[in-house]
Amino acid sequence: MMKGQLAGLMKQAQQMQENMKKMQEQLAQIEVEGQSGAGLVKVTMTCKNDVRRVSIDPSLLADDKDMLEDLVAAAFNDAVRKAEATAQEKMGGMTSGLPLPPGFKLPF
């Protein structure tokens, strides 16, 4: 490999690293909301999986504890899926053009 090509690759890698750092900071600010029980339980979290809020409709507090626990878990899982999808969408542009194998996931 020529010296100029190597320098170009190093510069490209450094720029990508800077862009990824900026995107990570942005993802920490983006909030998604997961729901279950037709919106009776809501979990709001960032795309970095930091939970910001859990909202439980008061009508559920007198109900079955097991059902409430299941609804909270389902809302949390819904929020995680939405956070992952949003992160993949936002980060997808950064990896386009890279020769990565299909299905390869970088640690976002």
From Swiss-Prot:
Alphabetic keyword roster: Cytoplasm, DNA-binding
Coiled-coil regions listed in the entry: none
Gene3D superfamilies the record matches: Nucleoid-associated protein YbaB-like domain
Comp. bias regions, Pro residues: 99-108
UniProt GO MF annotations: DNA binding
GO CC terms of this entry: bacterial nucleoid; cytosol
Top-level taxon of the source organism: Bacteria
Subcellular location field: Cytoplasm, Nucleoid
Region listing for Disordered, in residue ranges: 87-108
Keyword DNA-binding recorded: yes
Subunit structure and binding partners: Homodimer.
NCBIfam families hit by this protein: DNA_YbaB_EbfC
Homology family: Belongs to the YbaB/EbfC family.
Known role: Binds to DNA and alters its conformation. May be involved in regulation of gene expression, nucleoid organization and DNA protection.
Protein name per UniProt: Nucleoid-associated protein Bphy_0952
Organism: Paraburkholderia phymatum (strain DSM 17167 / CIP 108236 / LMG 21445 / STM815) (Burkholderia phymatum)
Lineage of the species this protein comes from: Bacteria, Pseudomonadati, Pseudomonadota, Betaproteobacteria, Burkholderiales
